[in-house]
């Protein structure tokens, strides 16, 4: 029966196994969260992009209708959510690569950098749209902007719902960035 001893400077193979298992778990969670964020941004873009309503009455020359493309802020919101959804779909490949190969660090650094850029884009689009939705619901009496959600309640319901999905994706991005930072820091030690 042979007894093997570990000399100083050697690392046993069993010591890296828990760390590798934790990194694999983080990578699997990263993959799942990216899928949820992609679905959330896609739902938000579709909900806002199809939001329109026509008033049931019309005058002889004027027909009262509202659509998302009437406001440039909503166009930016749809564009930002679409770009982020496309990025998330493409980043699933890299996220799956991290499940298979847990020791890759450079690709994780690239992913955390791009995640941060997309987080900023998504946050700016969602925040700008939230400001317009607030004015649509409550108006601004000092600027003489009247709320119009009482007349266009279906439209306002859709745009408010699309904000929920977008802000869920913002929270998921915060979690993804933190998890990537943890994964990168664990690989340096």
Curated annotation (Swiss-Prot):
It is a multi-pass membrane protein. InterPro entries: CASP/CASPL (IPR006459), CASP_dom (IPR006702), CASPL (IPR044173). Residues 1-21 are annotated as: Disordered. GO terms for cellular component: plasma membrane. Residues 47-73, 130-163 are extracellular. The keyword Membrane applies. The keyword Transmembrane applies. It is found in: Cell membrane. Residues 1-25, 95-108, 185-189 are cytoplasmic. It comes from the Eukaryota. GO terms for biological process: cell wall modification; cell-cell junction assembly. The chain crosses the membrane at residues 26-46, 74-94, 109-129, 164-184. Keywords: Cell membrane, Cell wall biogenesis/degradation, Membrane, Transmembrane, Transmembrane helix. It holds the Pfam family CASP_dom. Belongs to the Casparian strip membrane proteins (CASP) family. Regulates membrane-cell wall junctions and localized cell wall deposition. Required for establishment of the Casparian strip membrane domain (CSD) and the subsequent formation of Casparian strips, a cell wall modification of the root endodermis that determines an apoplastic barrier between the intraorganismal apoplasm and the extraorganismal apoplasm and prevents lateral diffusion. Homodimer and heterodimers. This is Casparian strip membrane protein 2.
């Amino acid at each position: 029966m042979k007894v093997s001893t570990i000399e100083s400077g050697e690392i046993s193979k069993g010591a890296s196994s828990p760390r590798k298992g934790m990194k694999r778990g983080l990578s699997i969670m990263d993959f799942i969260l990216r899928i949820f964020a992609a679905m959330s941004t896609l739902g938000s873009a579709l909900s806002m992009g199809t939001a329109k309503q026509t008033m049931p009455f019309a005058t002889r020359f004027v027909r009262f209708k509202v659509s998302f493309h009437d406001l440039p802020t909503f166009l930016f919101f749809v564009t930002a959510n679409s770009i982020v959804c496309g990025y998330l779909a493409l980043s699933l490949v890299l996220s799956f690569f991290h499940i298979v190969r847990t020791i890759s660090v450079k690709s994780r650094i690239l992913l955390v950098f791009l995640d941060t850029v997309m987080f900023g884009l998504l946050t700016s689009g969602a925040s700008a749209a939230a400001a317009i939705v607030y004015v649509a619901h409550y108006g601004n009496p000092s600027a003489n902007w009247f709320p119009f959600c009482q007349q266009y309640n279906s439209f306002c319901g859709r745009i408010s719902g699309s904000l929920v999905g977008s802000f869920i994706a913002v929270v998921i991005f915060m979690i993804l960035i933190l998890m990537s930072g943890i994964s990168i820091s664990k690989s340096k030690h």
